[in-house]
Amino acid sequence: MEKGYLALILHAHLPFVRHPEYKEFLEERWFFEALTETYIPLLSLFERLVNDKIEFYLTLSLSPTLLSMLNDTLLKERYINYLNKMIELCEKEIERTRFSPSFHKLALMYYYRFSKTKDKFLNQYNQDLIKEFKKYQDKGYLEIITCAATHGFLPLLLHKEAIKAQIEAGVSFYSKIFSTSPSGLWLPECGYFEGLDKFLKECGIKYFILETHGVLFARPRPKFGVYSSYYTKNRVAVFGRDPETSKSVWSSIEGYPGDYNYREYFRDIGFDLDYDYIKPYISPCGARIFTGIKYYKITGPTPYKEPYVPEKAREKAAEHAGNFMFNREKQIEYLYSVLGRKPIVVAPYDAELFGHWWFEGIDWLEFLIRKIKYDQNIFKLTTPSLYLKLYPKNQLINPAPSSWGWKGYYEVWLNGSNDWIYPHLHRAQETMINLAKRFKNVNGEKRRVLNQMVRELFLAQASDWAFMMKTGSFSEYAKKRVVTHLERFYLLKQFLEKDFINYEVLEDIENKDNIFPDLDYSLFHS
């Protein structure tokens, strides 16, 4: 009989990036890379496990923005073009490296990976990854949960109408896609403030996940630390993140991804090779970018790098999976002995860590699931919903304000680099609330304008933009996105004020920002 449980929770999210006004757009590659390196490999992993009759229980958060992109015809077409381009580059690399055995072997590996990915996407999945994820949920292996509509950082949205609208739109979109209601909701950036659980309860959410101190600093003090479920005063269950599992996988210094045998993310032929040779495969503006073809392993902390050896990296992934499992065995045995109940170790990660940032992460995950099944009997994999069925009665707590960002609170999304956006967002939210009251029961074209205004506001609220401004990565693009969506928001507002709609402009905006086709402005009714 098992003594406890491990809940692996993967949060799959990307901001909504879709630019039909351009033939090719650099930032759309974020989606293409994640498809190639994370989402399709995850589905392949699930397929292998099911074929081998290995039961597994994982929780997967699919954000509404990601689901929208997975469902978008234009992005699917562009993804196929991207794969064709990468296959062509791999063919050139096979020829270029023919006298360099170490690199030639890797060029062949990448050619095979891109070709296989294209075949799966087109022929096996019929370009419909959502259907594939749903299949594993229907079989009981996956618990798919939702997120706020555009990943808005809820503690900084200020207005209760704006907060509830983000949550309600995310839940509604999930229900439309999966024909069922989500049991859980991933709070964007795990951002929590006192009273947020009320909105979750109103939208039918059964549980959410917080950073460690969000539970540990709760009032009253949680009896079982982060190793149990709890209920908020509004009877929504909350789970806390385990710090040990976090450090061992997240940290590039102390954790597994920093092992010297693993692939070096930052050495890429997009930067290493002759400019004229690589130019057709980099940014349309001519800037060097990552292609995903990387020939070196981490090797050490110096610029010197040695060729990547996939076999050794895979051996390390198996070794690290075994180490992770051993540590969970000892951890859960101890917790079981002192808590008097079966503990749950909650291990949430960004899904894109596996395969994209940590190339061997998918292999590690597969080794771990297989080892848990065959190499031990101390704990089992579970999901938050399954654990709540086992322990339906739980202590009542009031979680602490928190996030999983740097320093654990709100500073990443509110600092000198991005604080300028909030007066504008809050003003737009007030405008939307007032317009929803003023035009309470309109139909036809005015309703169409109001619905598009909500789309623009949602897209401006995405937490990704403030995060990029803080890190300095793609910060100019992030600033432009916030400004552009707010400009479109106020342009649409003018149509209502002047009682004159420019249909050409409206259709252009609807075509560019076509997220959530069934969105209704009544979400902002008080």
Positions of PLM-derived features:
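CE4/NodB-like, metal-dependent polysaccharide N-deacetylase domain
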Residues: 163-187, 327-339, 343-348
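Short, solvent-exposed turn/loop segments enriched in Gly/Ser/Thr/Pro and often Arg
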Residues: 61-66, 148, 184-193, 213, ...
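His/Asp/Glu-enriched short active-site or ligand-binding loop at hydrolase and phosphoryl-transfer sites
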Residues: 153, 205-218, 381-383
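Glycine-rich phosphate-binding "P-loop"
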Residues: 146-169
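Conserved short loop/turn motifs at secondary-structure junctions
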Residues: 182-192, 350-354, 474
